[in-house]
């Protein structure tokens, strides 16, 4: 590898299935030169879960974590400190970062592993798997039941998650339920690459994300019970959904999933899939329909 790296206006794509399917990570560069191994050069897929401060004096509070212990770094991973329930990290200033890792955490069916809440506006990026596998997160694609339930829910200072990597392809039940609910400032969702779903895996995941305009592409062809229920409810600015499902027979799999989205938009479906209904449980009323 060269001693530095350079990105132009191309988008970066990654594959989780040896090149069969590709997903954008949301990385775009304008041509600036970055020092090799700086955070700007590290692909998000291989970056610890990271909060980027958009204002001075940002700390991140951990709550609903029970006895779980997280670790965080404010010096790009050179040193790490422990963070327990009810504590906040050291503060950093605008443009600086706080990285997180954890392993062996206890998962609560009501609270997941806990909630991470920044004190000022912040973007969240990097690989979520550093909260499951610690330093060994790269290449990991399995998460457990309830793993990230409520992880960022109602954390109103989170303004961007588009560069957050959720690489799991083996999902647990309700693993992402309410993960981003009530994040009223995010506009673009992270990619969701899984093609095999688990019960309730995305239920209410983006509930009340009222600024969301770009939904993740949904590649799974067979839905699981409750898997998409309430997923985009009250996403009032959402105008485009791509869903490639061909079997939507599972119990409550699309219950109220598009209730409260924008009055007009475009729904992209699998070619030949004609079993969709119109309304809150199917294709939004008055939306245009296209085949993928």
Listing of model-derived features with the role each one plays in the protein:
Residues 1-54, 58-61, 289-292:
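Enriched but not universal
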């Amino acid at each position: 590898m060269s001693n530095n790296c350079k990105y132009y206006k191309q988008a970066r794509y990654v594959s989780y299935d040896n090149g069969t399917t590709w997903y954008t990570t949301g990385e775009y560069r304008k041509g600036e030169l970055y020092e090799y191994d700086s955070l700007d050069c590290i692909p998000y897929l291989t970056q610890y879960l990271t909060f980027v401060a958009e204002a001075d004096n940002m700390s991140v509070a951990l709550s609903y974590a029970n006895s779980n212990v997280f670790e965080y770094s404010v010096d790009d991973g050179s040193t790490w400190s422990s963070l327990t329930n009810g504590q906040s990290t050291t503060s950093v200033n605008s443009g600086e970062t706080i990285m997180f890792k954890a392993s062996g955490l206890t998962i609560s069916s009501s609270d997941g592993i806990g909630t991470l809440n920044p004190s000022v506006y912040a973007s969240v990026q990097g690989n979520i798997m550093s909260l499951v596998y610690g330093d060994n997160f790269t290449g990991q694609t399995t998460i457990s039941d309830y793993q990230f339930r409520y992880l960022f829910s109602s954390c109103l200072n989170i303004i961007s998650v588009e560069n957050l990597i959720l690489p799991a392809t083996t999902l647990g039940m309700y693993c992402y339920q309410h993960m981003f609910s009530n994040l009223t400032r995010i506009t673009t969702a992270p990619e969701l690459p899984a093609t095999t779903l688990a019960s309730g895996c995305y239920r209410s995941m983006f509930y009340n994300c009222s600024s969301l305009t770009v939904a993740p592409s949904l590649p799974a062809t067979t839905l699981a019970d409750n898997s998409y229920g309430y997923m985009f409810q009250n996403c009032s600015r959402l105008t485009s959904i791509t869903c490639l499902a061909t079997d939507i027979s599972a119990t409550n799999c699309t219950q109220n999933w598009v209730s409260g989205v924008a009055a007009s938009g475009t729904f992209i479906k699998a070619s030949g899939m004609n079993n969709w209904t119109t309304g809150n449980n199917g294709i939004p009323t008055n939306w245009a329909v296209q085949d993928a």
